[in-house]
Amino acid sequence: MSAKDVKFHDSARSRIVKGVNVLADAVKVTLGPKGRNVLIERSFGAPTITKDGVSVAKEIELKDRFENMGAQVVKQVASKTADVAGDGTTTATVLAQSIVQEGMKHVAAGMNPMDLKRGIDKAVAAVLDELHRLSKPIKTSREIAQVGAISANADEAIGKIIADAMDKVGKEGVITVEDGKSLENELEVVEGMQFDRGYLSPYFINDPDKQVAHLDDPLILLHDKKISSIRDLLPVLEAAAKAGKPLLIIAEDVEGEALTTLVVNSMRGVLKVAAVKAPGFGDRRKALLEDIAILTGATVISEETGKQLEKATLEELGRAKRVEVQKENTIIIDGAGDQTRIDARVKAIRAQIEEATSDYDREKLQERVAKLAGGVAVIKVGAATEVEMKEKKDRVDDALHATRAAVEEGIVPGGGVALLRARSAISSLTGANADQDAGIRIVLRALEAPLRVIAANAGDEPSVVVAKVLSGKGNYGYNAATGEYGDLVETGVVDPTKVTRTALQNAASIAGLILTTDATVAEAPKEEKAVPAPAPELEY
């Protein structure tokens, strides 16, 4: 086991804070409509230009091991916020930096870190309640477009295309982002269904760049039991090979020799095949398999209906134009099912929704309707160069996640104003002691940080902007894109409540952990042994 380097107290915390600041300072230049670009070197090919906070955070690794710990911890804030809300990564990083910096001053002054953390947690809980109170639901296509545009760094074209996609496939429909072939963004809508089960083996992948298995015009086998014997599968495999078509197997599970044989055939190119687990559990799995069967024109091979896998015929297999199997999702596009049967199935599920008593059942039934009736919208991102295409795709992904979050939990005024208004919930809040009061004041100051950074990136004086916004009420705030003050909701400067909430929660959580850290352990640098100089050559 290699030797470790251990640091305690202030010497440990100061190095962590240095790492936090390096990462946060690199990320926060991207915040707001006037945010700057960050140029990232690649080990091969052209450098990447981005205004996406999480993309910048992911690239940062520091040479000093102790500083790197601080940077990596804050990187978690950005990636966790991106995973949950899809946006707000830069805001979360700015909030975390502010709480850590202010908190460290109090810790250095001798305050109890645990009480500071209790004060911070108490203040954050009150602010989250206030954000929910300020939130308003999102209804119109125009509001969806506004949220998308803000999240895509004030790109209205991206906001509009996302709103159009949601109009076409519904708010619950599946929307994917692909590389376009022209300079303009394009929207393509195809019938399809997505469920949350991915490939059973990574060896089924045939597109290594995207880490997915693409099957064009495949046959689809649906089975409600485990498949472990290859003998049971042989008739279907032979039928698919004769037809010269790829095969998608959806079953309770595929294991043992059956899975091994499928992997070997796939790798050798004998048969393009992918196997996935059936979605859901119990009765819900049966219902979802039946949905897929109706969508693709298949018959579920089930003992309940007297069907046996070893006697399955080509007519009992479903068909689709294309199937995309990802690590955790499968998308069936343009199934060959009969439209009248699909409509009847949707009608039957809608009747079940009316009779459903629990919210959970109702939600799951609505998901099934969306998958059967909604389809898949594909946004094709257009750009002049590959570098621009990658940067634009990142922004479209962000905007798409943000609009979904807005539909889910509503919107609040953007531009850091919602957090500033939420200060009213904690301005008179007190803790159990002076140290907890200090924790509350730390959050009070941190809530100004996003607006200060937005103003600084736009070239304005942060203190003047904060004072002017605080002099107004409600949605009154600073529009950094135009440099004007006014009602931000009316002018379309809005943030999804979920994004703002998640950013603050994650920032406070990680900052609290850093403040209560008293020792750091890292691998000690290895001492390089000096290479002896070569002996001089003798002259003859």
Curated annotation (Swiss-Prot):
A Gene Ontology biological process term: protein refolding
Q: Name one GO molecular function term.
A: unfolded protein binding
Looking at the keywords, is GTP-binding present? no
Known InterPro entries for this protein?
Chaperonin_Cpn60_CS, Cpn60/GroEL, Cpn60/GroEL/TCP-1, GroEL-like_apical_dom_sf, GROEL-like_equatorial_sf, TCP-1-like_intermed_sf
- Asked if the Swiss-Prot or TrEMBL record annotates the protein with the keyword Chaperone, the reply is yes
The UniProt entry, under Gene3D superfamilies, shows:
GroEL, GroEL-like equatorial domain, TCP-1-like chaperonin intermediate domain
Q: How does it assemble?
A: Forms a cylinder of 14 subunits composed of two heptameric rings stacked back-to-back. Interacts with the co-chaperonin GroES.
Q: What is this protein called?
A: Chaperonin GroEL 2/3
* Source organism of the structure: Paraburkholderia xenovorans (strain LB400)
